[in-house]
Amino acid sequence: MSVPGIVPEFARIAPDVKLGRDVTIHGLVNLYGCEIGDGTMIGAFVEIQKKARIGRRCKVSSHSFICEGVVIDDECFIGHHVVFINDRYPAAVNPDGSPQTAADWQVIGTRVERRASIGSGTVVLCGVTIGEGAIVGAGSVVTHDVPPRTVVAGNPARALRRLPA
């Protein structure tokens, strides 16, 4: 597969990945079963899992992890080291002590709406929606929905102010 900005031996892009036009992917990425929209840039050391969808003209900065069930709409910014979580109660073993497998958990989706911006080092827990045009400050832990055009920050992230329409 030929993609601008990639040295193939340093990137793992599975055959089931759907890449839009003019996507730029920097080396040392792991992409499988995902969809990436036109004009989006994916930084180095990023993993995007199956059934995740990234919209058009987004920027996903280096070292970020976008797991199954995450939908990022058009024109969003994802800072460095942003982590999305898709399992509300992660565990290594079941109550009986047997190792957990993929069949033992339920994926809970997350949505990032158009033109939202997520600062570096943020953790986004499952089941939340980050509203259109919202800004999440660096290092935040997002545990609840973020309303559109709202600036949030902290652990847990709290609303700091509303942005003009």
Enumerate the predicted regions with their spans.
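Flexible, glycine/small-residue-enriched loop-and-beta-strand segment within the central core
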Residues: S2-P15, I25-C126, N155-P156, R161-P164
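C-terminal/domain-terminus segments
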Residues: V128-D145, R149-V151
